[in-house]
Structures are given as C-alpha cells and as structure tokens.
C-alpha cells in the first residue's frame, strides 16, 4: 500500500468558557476580529469525517511543554551557534491560551487567526502545523513532538543577527516558528489539536498560542550569560532556563 506524509507549518508575527474575557471587546484586538468572538462551537466544514479534539490531558500538556523547554534550553545555553540568553523563562501551560487555540483548530483550515489576545497577554503569538498521511499509524503524541521539533529546526536558517532585532521582512526559508519558540517574553503557552479524516487520508492539525509574539525590530531574546538575569533562580531540569516561577512582561518594549 502506498504511504505518504505531508506536513505544513505556519507561524504568526504581529502582529466558551464563562470564566474567560469578553472576546468581542474591541480593546483586545488591533488587527481584526478575535478568533473567539461569537465563534461557532462546532467543527467547520473543512474538518472532513469524524473530527475530534485530541484530549489535552496531563500527558499531552507535559509532552508539549517538555519538548519546548528542552529546545529553549539549548538556545539559552548557547548551542547551535546562538548567543546565550540571560533570562529565558520556562514555558508553563495556560488554559485560556489553549481554549482560544481551540477556536482556530476546530475550523480545520490551515491559517492564522487575526487575533488571539487575552486580557493578560495583548501580543499573543501562534504557531501552526498540519500533517496529512495515509498508510501510517501515527499517534497524536508522535505528531505533536514532531511538529515542535520541525519548528525548532528552522534555527538552521535563522541569521544570528535576528536575536537582537526581529526583521521587518525576511526572505528565504521560514524562521518564525523557531523565533516564536525561543522568545524570552513568552512564558506561557496553550495548544489545541484536532484529528480528522478525508477519505483514506488522516490529518492532525496543531495550534499553539503563546503569551508573546515576535515583535518587529525588537529582540527575540536578551543576550547574556545563561540564566544570569533570572529573578527566581534557574530551572534544575532545564539548564539555562529560569525557574517555572519566573514571570516576565509579555509586552512590546515600545509600550
């Protein structure tokens, strides 16, 4: 039987729980409607047959966080030719960011939403990935880990000078997923994943939202001895990252 896999990635740069904000509040968004404003709760027509959410249980959350933080720590410690990061926080899970990600995921359309901000995070970022395959027995955990690694692998094409100033424009292979992953003003993340079918083809679509996005002409992270500016100490599990208690301001330096 013929087997094939197609994977696509996309990243964003800036730019229905009752316990969450009014997402139709125009003060949340500068660039268009919020993805969760008056959004349908059912799956979209693009979701093919048998669409369902992958359960973001403790195992899946930990897998995504562990993979992200392992790779962030590599950059924080100066691997792959990048400068060390003075204050790279450990990413922790945020249920609201994950909740908002579900509104994009349930459309099954591989495209960024225009706005995914929260009251706390006014510059939320986003990474997307989708895969289509037939003849394989991939599981959600396999795909989530693979997506994250592929995002990170963009470091091979990312000029080191971008660390100090994210460019207005970039030509060449994608680098935005990688820069989103290692942004030192991102300290929270939340993801949603959908599994569905189109005939014999099986698809997984992953949406991860982050507390901060790539800001044009601003640093991706601050150079310095690894962890030297952490205010709560370093994470013993992920050397070079600040402890999980480290909270940073997910804001533009321009205010």
UniProtKB/Swiss-Prot annotation:
Saliva (at protein level). Female salivary gland. No or low-level expression in female hemolymph, midgut, Malpighian tubule system and ovary. No or low-level expression in male tissues. The keyword Metal-binding does not apply. Glycans are attached at residues 146, 209. Induction: (Microbial infection) Infection with dengue virus or Zika virus does not affect expression. CDD domains: CAP_euk. Residues 1-21 form the signal peptide. Disruption phenotype: (Microbial infection) RNAi-mediated knockdown results in reduced enhancement of dengue and Zika virus infections in human dendritic cells and macrophages after the treatment with salivary gland extracts. Lower viremia and better survival in mice bitten by mosquitoes transmitting Zika virus. No significant effects on Zika virus load in the mosquito salivary glands. Keywords: Glycoprotein, Host endosome, Host mitochondrion, Secreted, Signal. InterPro entries: CAP_dom, CAP_sf, CRISP-related, P14a_insect, V5_allergen-like. Residues 65-210 form the SCP domain. It is found in: Secreted; Host endosome; Host mitochondrion. It comes from the Eukaryota. GO terms for cellular component: extracellular region; host cell endosome; host cell mitochondrion. PANTHER family: CYSTEINE-RICH SECRETORY PROTEIN-RELATED. Interacts with human LRPPRC; the interaction interrupts association between BECN1 and LRPPRC. Interacts with human CD4. (Microbial infection) Interacts with Zika virus envelope protein E and Zika virus-like particles; the interaction does not affect Zika virus replication in human endothelial cells and keratinocytes. Patients with dengue virus or Zika virus infections during the acute or early convalescence phase have higher levels of IgG serum antibodies against the protein. Belongs to the CRISP family. Activates autophagy in human monocytic cells, dendritic cells and macrophages. Promotes activation of human CD4(+) T-cells. Does not affect cytokine expression in human monocytic cells. (Microbial infection) Promotes dengue virus type 2 replication in human monocytic cells, dendritic cells and macrophages. Pro-viral properties are linked to BECN1-mediated autophagy activation in the host. Does not directly interact with the purified envelope protein of dengue virus type 2. This is Venom allergen-1. It comes from Aedes aegypti (Yellowfever mosquito).
């Amino acid at each position: 039987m013929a087997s094939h896999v197609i994977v696509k990635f996309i990243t964003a740069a800036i730019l229905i729980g009752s316990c969450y904000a009014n997402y139709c509040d125009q003060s949340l968004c500068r660039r268009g409607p919020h993805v969760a404003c008056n959004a349908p709760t059912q799956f979209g027509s693009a979701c093919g047959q048998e669409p369902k959410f992958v359960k973001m249980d403790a195992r899946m959350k930990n897998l995504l966080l562990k993979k992200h933080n392992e790779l962030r720590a590599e950059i924080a410690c100066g691997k792959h030719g990048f400068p060390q990061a003075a204050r790279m926080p450990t990413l922790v899970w945020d249920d609201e960011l994950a909740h908002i990600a579900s509104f994009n995921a349930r459309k099954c359309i591989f495209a960024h939403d225009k706005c995914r901000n929260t009251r706390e995070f006014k510059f939320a970022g986003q990474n997307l990935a989708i895969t289509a395959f037939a003849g394989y027995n991939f599981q959600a955990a396999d795909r989530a880990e693979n997506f994250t690694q592929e995002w990170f692998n963009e470091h091979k094409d990312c000029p080191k000078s971008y660390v100090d100033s994210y460019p207005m424009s970039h030509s060449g292979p994608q680098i935005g997923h990688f820069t989103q992953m290692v942004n030192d003003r991102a300290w929270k993340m939340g993801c949603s994943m959908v599994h569905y079918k189109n005939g014999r083809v099986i698809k997984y679509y992953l949406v991860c939202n982050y507390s901060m996005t790539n800001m044009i002409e601003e640093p991706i992270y601050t150079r310095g001895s690894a962890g030297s500016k952490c205010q709560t100490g370093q994470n013993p599990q992920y050397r070079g990252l600040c402890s999980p208690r480290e909270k940073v301001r997910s804001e533009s330096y321009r205010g």
